[in-house]
Amino acid sequence: MARPPYRAEQRNQIFACFINAASELMENEGMESLTLRRVAKRAGYNSATLYNYFKDLDHLTVYASMKYFEDYNRNLARYLADEQDAFQRFLFMWRFFCASAFRHPHAYYNLFYGKYSGELTEIIHAYYEVFPEELGELDDSVLEMLTCGSLVERNWQMLQ
């Protein structure tokens, strides 16, 4: 007899387990160490289970790369809190973005230029549905910018 389907909360927990396992492997052993089997083993699941949540390793890698934005989100909100001028906020956001991107180039490349960059808006929304605490305390304009998928959309959002 087949197992009953997982509830949404259980699916989100398993989804988070895989993302956390992949993120830990990326952080501790580098991108080259990332395989579906290693991620599944670290998460405590069969590698076939991963395909219920991710299309392939690249898809999982994009989600795991989102972990690098946690510090970025928190610090960006803190630094932008006192600046009211939209252009100055825009310039600061880009300086901060570039500094973060140079610290984790593989993660930023995967997100904005990788195989699934065209799906980034959907990926961002799905990710923050499971990890809402990583957004921190953001004002509405920064929150809207962070949930845009493309860099063009992010720029437009910050300049409005």
Name these PLM-found stretches:
Residues 1-42:
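Basic, helix-initiating cap at the start of DNA-binding domains
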Residues 5, 26-31, 44, 51-63:
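HTH DNA-binding helix-turn interface
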Residues 15, 61, 65, 69, ...:
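Amphipathic, non-transmembrane alpha-helical scaffold segments
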Residues 17, 21, 89-92, 96, ...:
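Alpha-helical elements of Rossmann-like donor-binding domains used by nucleotide-donor carbohydrate transfer enzymes
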Residues 35, 109-112, 120:
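Short, hydrophobic secondary-structure boundary micro-motifs
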Residues 36, 66-73:
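Short, basic, alpha-helical segments at the C-terminal edge of helix-turn-helix-like DNA-binding modules
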Residues 78-109:
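Hydrophobic alpha-helical connector segments
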Residues 118-160:
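Amphipathic alpha-helical packing segments from all-alpha helical-bundle domains
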